[in-house]
Amino acid sequence: AKTNFDGITYAKGASVLKQLVAWVGEDAFYEGARRYFAEHQFGATNLQDLLVALEGASRQELSSWKNAWLETSGPSTLSASWTTDAVGAITDFTLHQSGEACGGVLRPHRVTVSTWRVAAGALDRTHSFDVRIEGEQTPIDPDGVLAVPGGAASADLVVINDDDLTYAISRLDERSTDVALTYVASIDVALTRAVIWASLWNAVRDGLLDPRRFIVAVLTAVPAETEPAIRDRLLLFVAEAISSFLPGGLRTDVHDQVLATTIRLSRETQDADAWRSYTRAFIAEFAARGGDEYEATVRGFAASDNPDIAWRARRALAARGLVDAGVVEAWRSADGSGEAARMSVEALASLPIEEARSHAWDSVYSETLSNDFLTATLAGLQASSWDGEAGIEAAVDRLRSYWESHTIGMALRYANGVLAYGLDIDRDGSVERSVGLLRSWLDTNGDAPAQLRRIVIEHLDAFERDERVQRRWKQDQ
């Protein structure tokens, strides 16, 4: 169960339930739910009982809906196309569905497609279309609302799945992508902003949008972002865009820009939550790639009276080799909290010296670490700026034996911790130590536990995506 119920499981489950409500209609859904609870009170039920109640209330057949949504995996892909004539009228405004990412399955979707116009430097919604699609395509504007002279002027941006009603990858067209990157922060509806950012991020992950353009857009937009959850997620996306989707040769300039922008925002903001977000992003970027001119700033944060910020900065200094074990131990002695204990373990493991790394790897196999300390030790080893033999090949060789000799909780932490290293196509041997190593492991461990093979396959898939996207943008160097 631990390997099956993950973030994707819950996210898809919530999206599918939300889509079911949209598909049958909110009134029909609640009426069906009332019938369901009334008929089965104090009894045991299954999914079919709920669907029968919803079918009665909505007068829609739902067995095909269930088959398409609950017995298949992967997201649908939705996109839009249209034609603009000489007088600016939009015709053939069409919603398309691809099942390439979900085994060719074409699902029933009910979505909102909205159009937006740039006016006075901001985006205003002009139209909203309620669209149902079951096959490869369906018209978005059957009444021809936009099929009038000048209609295109009200569609600078086309947003698919605006109300986030379905589980799908929503593609922005080229013009909408350009407009979104420039003006997304001006949209006054947080959900729409989140949907647009998700579309842009999926384009980055699929090699369709240059990560550098995405990063610039995020750094420009986050000061105006009023939703902390969106702001924090975008800053995490920036870090991942650099480390996963840009080859090493393209990272330096972006890294410098991220450091300069996040520390500036940290100093300028008057909002405590925003300060924490920008400071964390700054420290994380410093930890990942350094920056001599910012060392004093990070040392200042290491002395902060905010324990979270202080320990993040201390861990960053350790990972860059700017403090030694004695300093980390002194910090630990001055802070008796459990979080300090965990962070100090991670900091010590991240020290880029052979003795510290050898001790950390020995502790991983010592059977003395708690769950949290195992995770912290592996995270420290991966975060280190150490440039020598990382010990990953030996750790991967022990995946199966560790899995079969430990509890599922420890085994999961070990497998995911060991495999959480990066890929850089510009670094000698990096592809072989990631893609090649895991392919070889899978070839020679065909009879390994299915749950373990699944974890390795998922990490291999991520490495293959990283390699594919990095090679796409290396061509533009």
Language model features with spans:
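Acidic, glycine-rich low-complexity/disordered segments
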Residues: 21-26
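Metalloprotease/metallohydrolase-associated module, dominated by Zn2+-dependent proteases
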Residues: 1-9
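Non-catalytic accessory/interaction domains
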Residues: 8, 13-16, 27-31, 38-477
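Alpha-helical hydrophobic/aromatic positions enriched in membrane-embedded helices and signal peptides
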Residues: 4, 17-18
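A short, structure-level motif marking secondary-structure boundaries and short turns
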Residues: 2, 35-36
